[in-house]
C-alpha cells in the first residue's frame, strides 16, 4: 500500500477537477429528478405498457434516482469537508463512518441491475401468456424478488463489514487510492450486466420471430403487436442502462490494472468524471418518454395497417365466395 502525504490528500480534495465534478452532478440531479417525475406521470396516465411492466419500470426509475441521490450525497459530503476542514486528517473519512453509506449506495445500484432481470422475466412471461402475467400484482412480486436478491447479493459482498483503521478521501469507494483499488467487487457486476444484455438481445430476436406468424383476428393481431413492441422497447431500455453500468465498471477495472505500477493520487478525480449514474438518471426516464411516443405512433400505424389488410382480405374472401356461388 502506498503512503499518501497530507499535502497530496489536500491537493486531491481541494482540486477544482473534483469540485467541478460535484457541481456537475448536482446540476444533473435537478434535471434527472424533473424528467423522472414526468416519466412516471406518463407511465401512469398513458397506460402504454401493461400494469406489471409499468410497475417494474416505475420501480426501476425510482431506484436509479435513489442510487444517484446516494452517490451525490457522498460526493457533496466530501466537497463540504474540502471547504470547511483545513487538515488532511479532518478531510479524510474513517471506514467505519463510511461503511453504512457505501453499502446503501451499492445496494441501490444492485437493485437497478436485478430489476433488469425482473423486467426480462416479465416480458418473456407476458409474451408467452399476456392475460395471465399482465396484472400489476405480478410486477409487484417480481419487484419484491429483485429486492430480496439484491439484499442477498449486497450482504455477500460486504458481510465482512468496514475495514478498521482505513481512511479514505471519499465514502464512495471502499478504497479510493488507485493503487489499492479492488476489482473483486466489480467483476460480479460485469457478469450480471453482460448476462442481462445477452438475455435482452435474445428476447428481441424471439419476439421478432413470433411477429411473423399472422392471424385473421384484428384483436389478437393487435394484442400480439402490442406485446412485441413493448418487449422490444423494454429490452432496449434495459440494454441502455446496463451498458452505462458496464462502461464505468469496465473502465474502472482496466484503469486500475493500467495504473497499478505507476499510480497517481490525482487519478481518483478523473475517475469521478466517468461515473455514469448521473447520466443514467437522465437518459433512462428520457428513453421512457421517447419510447412512449414511439409505441403510440406504432400502435396507430399498426391498427390502420391491420384494419386495411383485414378489409382487403375479407373483400377477396367474399369475392371468391361470390364467384363460387354464381357458378
UniProtKB/Swiss-Prot annotation:
Q: Where in the cell is it found?
A: Membrane
Segments traversing the membrane: 20-40, 56-76, 133-153, 186-206, 227-247, 270-290
Keyword annotations for this protein, in alphabetical order, are: Membrane, Transmembrane, Transmembrane helix
This entry's Gene Ontology molecular function terms read: G protein-coupled receptor activity; olfactory receptor activity
Domain of life according to the entry: Eukaryota
InterPro entries per the record?
Answer: 7TM_GPCR_serpentine_rcpt_Sra (IPR000344), Nematode_rcpt-like_serp_alpha (IPR051080)
Q: Which residues form a coiled coil?
A: none
One of the GO biological process terms: detection of chemical stimulus involved in sensory perception
How does the protein associate with the membrane? Multi-pass membrane protein
Gene Ontology cellular component terms for the protein in this record: membrane
**Annotated family:** Belongs to the nematode receptor-like protein sra family.
The protein depicted here goes by the name Serpentine receptor class alpha-33
Amino acid at each position: 500500500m502506498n503512503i499518501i502525504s497530507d499535502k497530496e490528500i489536500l491537493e486531491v480534495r481541494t482540486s477544482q477537477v473534483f469540485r467541478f465534478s460535484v457541481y456537475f452532478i448536482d446540476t444533473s440531479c435537478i434535471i434527472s429528478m424533473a424528467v423522472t417525475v414526468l416519466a412516471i406521470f406518463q407511465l401512469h396516465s398513458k397506460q402504454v405498457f401493461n400494469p406489471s411492466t409499468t410497475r417494474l419500470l416505475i420501480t426501476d426509475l425510482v431506484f436509479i434516482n435513489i442510487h444517484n441521490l446516494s452517490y451525490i450525497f457522498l460526493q457533496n459530503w466530501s466537497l463540504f469537508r474540502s471547504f470547511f476542514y483545513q487538515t488532511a486528517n479532518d478531510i479524510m473519512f474513517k471506514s467505519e463512518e463510511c461503511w453504512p453509506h457505501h453499502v446503501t449506495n451499492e445496494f441501490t445500484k444492485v437493485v437497478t441491475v436485478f430489476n433488469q432481470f425482473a423486467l426480462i422475466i416479465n416480458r418473456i412471461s407476458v409474451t408467452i401468456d399476456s392475460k395471465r402475467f399482465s396484472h400489476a400484482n405480478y410486477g409487484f412480486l417480481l419487484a419484491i424478488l429483485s429486492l430480496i436478491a439484491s439484499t442477498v447479493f449486497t450482504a455477500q459482498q460486504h458481510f465482512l463489514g468496514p475495514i478498521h483503521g482505513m481512511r479514505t478521501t471519499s465514502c464512495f469507494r471502499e478504497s479510493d487510492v488507485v493503487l489499492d483499488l479492488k476489482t473483486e467487487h466489480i467483476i460480479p457486476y460485469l457478469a450480471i450486466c453482460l448476462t442481462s444484455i445477452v438475455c435482452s438481445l435474445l428476447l428481441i430476436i424471439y419476439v421478432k420471430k413470433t411477429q411473423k406468424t399472422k392471424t385473421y383476428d384484428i384483436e389478437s393481431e393487435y394484442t400480439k403487436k402490442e406485446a412485441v413492441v413493448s418487449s422490444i422497447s423494454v429490452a432496449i431500455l434495459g440494454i441502455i442502462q446496463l451498458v452505462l453500468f458496464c462502461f464505468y465498471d469496465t473502465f474502472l477495472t482496466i484503469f486500475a490494472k493500467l495504473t497499478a505500477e505507476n499510480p497517481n493520487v490525482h487519478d481518483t478525480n478523473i475517475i469521478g468524471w466517468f461515473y455514469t449514474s448521473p447520466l443514467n438518471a437522465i437518459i433512462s426516464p428520457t428513453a421512457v418518454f421517447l419510447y412512449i411516443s414511439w409505441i403510440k405512433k406504432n400502435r396507430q400505424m399498426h391498427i390502420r395497417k391491420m384494419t386495411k389488410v383485414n378489409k382487403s382480405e375479407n373483400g377477396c374472401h367474399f369475392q371468391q365466395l361470390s364467384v363460387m356461388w354464381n357458378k
